[in-house]
């Protein structure tokens, strides 16, 4: 084995010697791995030198060629130089239009936006927005909005909104809103809103709202709202709201004299004399004489005389009594379970007569057949065929007394015997 190892190492060294002289690229790692050679007895320095040379040659075998890399870099740089764009000739470039001193964007000197000198927006000198000299918005000299000189909004001289001289809104001289001279809103002279002279709202002279002179709202002279003279709201003379003379509200609202709301004299709301709300004399709310709310005489709420709320107290008492009766009835109903148990005990002897109580002391149950089930056989009977009730036995005290007395006697006898 030792001879074999020496032979393998010497073979590797010889081949490596030939490789360095003849430039052959050979990978000896595979050969070593395949043969499974052990290097335990081989000189370490020899193996180290061989591995260094082997790794260098392996790198060249994998295609690492520094010469080729240099050539590629040079070619890449050359391509980059060819891709660079050529600088354009300066004499072919278009130059931006130079503005005059103090201008922006090619305007004339002191202008903005292509306007003439001192203008804004293409206006004449000193104008804004294409207006004539000293104007704004295409108006004549000193005007605003296309108005005549000194006007606003296309109005005549000194006017606003197309009105006559000194007017506003197309009104006559000194007027507002197309009114006559000194008027507002198309009214006659000194009027407001198309009213006659000195009126407001189309009323006659001194009136408001188309009323007669001194009236308001189309009323007769001195009236309000189309009423007769001195009236309000179409009432007769001195009345309010269409009432008779001297009345208020029919007397108010079409009532008789001194009445309110269509009631009889001195009444309110269509009631009889002195009444309120259509009630009989002295009544309120349509009740009988002296009543309230349609009740009988002296009553309240539709109750009989002296009662309130349909005998609410009695009704409550009746309800309470009914509730007590229901409670008593429930208390007298025996337990269904006890009934079934007792029925099973006395099934063969039960009849239409009451049975003995199910207990001898305290509360129990007793039962009998119903008349309709009198002919039924005992085995066919059920709870629905029986009449039942709770029964109470009072023998408990007597039994207790007998037992206690007996115990006393026993105790006395025992004491006597031992003494």
Curated annotation (Swiss-Prot):
Glycans are attached at residue 360. Residues 92-96 are annotated as: Region I. InterPro entries: Crcmsprzoite, TSP1_rpt, TSP1_rpt_sf. SMART domains: TSP1. This is Circumsporozoite protein. It holds the Pfam family TSP_1. Residues 99-314 are annotated as: 54 X 4 AA approximate tandem repeats of N-A-G-G. Belongs to the plasmodium circumsporozoite protein family. Sequence repeats lie at residues 99-102, 103-106, 107-110, 111-114, 115-118, 119-122, 123-126, 127-130, 131-134, 135-138, 139-142, 143-146, 147-150, 151-154, 155-158, 159-162, 163-166, 167-170, 171-174, 175-178, 179-182, 183-186, 187-190, 191-194, 195-198, 199-202, 203-206, 207-210, 211-214, 215-218, 219-222, 223-226, 227-230, 231-234, 235-238, 239-242, 243-246, 247-250, 251-254, 255-258, 259-262, 263-266, 267-270, 271-274, 275-278, 279-282, 283-286, 287-290, 291-294, 295-298, 299-302, 303-306, 307-310, 311-314. Residues 397-419 form a propeptide. Residues 65-95 have a biased composition (Basic and acidic residues). Essential sporozoite protein. In the mosquito vector, required for sporozoite development in the oocyst, migration through the vector hemolymph and entry into the vector salivary glands. In the vertebrate host, required for sporozoite migration through the host dermis and infection of host hepatocytes. Binds to highly sulfated heparan sulfate proteoglycans (HSPGs) on the surface of host hepatocytes. It comes from Plasmodium cynomolgi (strain Mulligan/NIH). Its main location: membrane. Residues 81-89 are annotated as: Required for the binding to heparan sulfate proteoglycans (HSPGs) on the surface of host hepatocytes. The keyword Cell inner membrane does not apply. A lipid is attached at residue 396 (GPI-anchor amidated cysteine). Residues 50-111, 146-237, 312-332 are annotated as: Disordered. During host cell invasion, proteolytically cleaved at the cell membrane in the region I by a papain-like cysteine protease of parasite origin. Cleavage is triggered by the sporozoite contact with highly sulfated heparan sulfate proteoglycans (HSPGs) present on the host hepatocyte cell surface. Cleavage exposes the TSP type-1 (TSR) domain and is required for productive invasion of host hepatocytes but not for adhesion to the host cell membrane. Cleavage is dispensable for sporozoite development in the oocyst, motility and for traversal of host and vector cells. O-glycosylated; maybe by POFUT2. It is found in: Cell membrane; Cytoplasm. Disulfide bonds join 357-391, 361-396. Residues 1-23 form the signal peptide.
């Amino acid at each position: 084995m030792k001879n074999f190892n020496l032979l393998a190492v010497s073979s590797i060294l010889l081949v490596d010697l030939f490789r360095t002289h003849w430039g052959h690229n050979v990978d000896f790692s595979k050969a070593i791995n395949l043969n499974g050679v052990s290097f335990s007895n081989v000189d370490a320095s020899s193996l180290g030198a061989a591995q260094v040379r082997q790794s260098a040659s392996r790198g060249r075998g994998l295609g690492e060629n520094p010469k080729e890399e240099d050539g590629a870099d040079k070619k890449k740089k050359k391509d980059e130089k060819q891709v660079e764009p050529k600088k354009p000739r300066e004499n072919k470039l278009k130059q931006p239009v130079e503005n005059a001193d103090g201008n922006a964007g090619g305007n004339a000197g002191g202008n903005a936006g292509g306007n003439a000198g001192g203008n804004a927006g293409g206006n004449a000198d000193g104008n804004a927005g294409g207006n004539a000299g000293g104007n704004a918005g295409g108006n004549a000299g000193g005007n605003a909005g296309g108005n005549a000189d000194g006007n606003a909004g296309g109005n005549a001289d000194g006017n606003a909104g197309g009105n006559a001289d000194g007017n506003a809104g197309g009104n006559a001289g000194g007027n507002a809103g197309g009114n006559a001279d000194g008027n507002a809103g198309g009214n006659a002279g000194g009027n407001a809103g198309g009213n006659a002279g000195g009126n407001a709202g189309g009323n006659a002279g001194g009136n408001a709202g188309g009323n007669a002179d001194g009236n308001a709202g189309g009323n007769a002279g001195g009236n309000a709202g189309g009423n007769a003279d001195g009236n309000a709201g179409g009432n007769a003379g001195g009345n309010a709201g269409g009432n008779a003379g001297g009345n208020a509200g029919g007397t108010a609202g079409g009532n008789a004299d001194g009445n309110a709301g269509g009631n009889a004299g001195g009444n309110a709301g269509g009631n009889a004399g002195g009444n309120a709300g259509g009630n009989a004399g002295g009544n309120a709310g349509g009740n009988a004489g002296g009543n309230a709310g349609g009740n009988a005489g002296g009553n309240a709420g539709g109750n009989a005389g002296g009662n309130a709320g349909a005998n609410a107290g009695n009704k409550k008492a009746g309800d309470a009594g009914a509730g007590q009766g229901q409670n008593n009835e429930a208390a007298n109903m025996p337990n269904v379970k006890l009934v079934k148990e007792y029925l099973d005990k006395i099934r063969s002897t039960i009849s239409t007569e009451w049975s003995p109580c199910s207990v001898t002391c305290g509360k129990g149950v007793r039962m009998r057949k119903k008349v309709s089930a009198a002919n039924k056989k005992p085995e066919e009977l059920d709870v629905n065929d029986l009449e039942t009730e709770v029964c109470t036995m009072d023998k408990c005290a007597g039994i207790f007394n007998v037992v206690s007395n007996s115990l006393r006697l026993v105790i006395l006898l025992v004491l006597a015997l031992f003494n």
